[in-house]
Design a protein with these regions (language model features):
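Short basic helix-loop element that most often maps to the first helix and adjoining turn
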Residues: 12-14, 43-58, 87
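Amphipathic alpha-helical interface surfaces
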Residues: 7, 37, 41, 69, ...
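Short coil/loop linkers at secondary-structure junctions
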Residues: 15-17, 55, 66, 95
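Short alpha-helical DNA-recognition segment
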Residues: 53-72
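N-terminal flexible/basic segments that precede or flank functional cores
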Residues: 1-40, 103-116
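Short, conserved catalytic or interaction motifs in soluble domains
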Residues: 75
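DNA major-groove recognition helix of helix-turn-helix/homeodomain DNA-binding modules
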Residues: 82-99
Length: 116
């Protein structure tokens, strides 16, 4: 969730320091990307499960796990691995498409495109 610019200005004017959680936690660029990927997958799993008309219990049965574990998967809990997130998304009926960069690395950062 992002803060509105109006609220950000009001907090700054009141003397508060406003920033992102990643700044506060001093996450590296790689750690930020990992957190973003985990949260994106977790949100996609919940949306896909709901769109497929599945309960958390039903998705858990497909995965061979419990409803409480599915709840942890859907919030991207730290003890949930990336492969568990991917398995949950596909078990809910989702499909992941990866598109590698078009050309080899040229010293510049390249982007791997992932469509959920």
């Amino acid at each position: 969730m992002t803060m509105t610019s109006k609220k950000r200005k009001a907090l700054t004017a009141a003397g508060w320091r406003v920033g992102e959680a990643a700044d506060f936690l001093r996450l590296t660029a790689e750690e930020r990307q990992l957190v973003e990927l985990r949260l994106t997958l977790a949100l996609a799993i919940r949306r896909q499960r709901q769109a497929s008309g599945l309960s958390q219990k039903q998705l858990g049965e497909r995965l061979g796990t419990t409803q409480p574990r599915v709840a942890k998967i859907e919030v991207g809990a730290p003890d949930v691995s990336l492969d568990q997130l991917v398995r949950a998304y596909t078990a809910a009926g989702g499909r992941i498409e990866c598109q590698p960069p078009r050309s080899p690395a040229t010293g510049k950062a390249s982007r791997l495109k992932v469509a959920l």
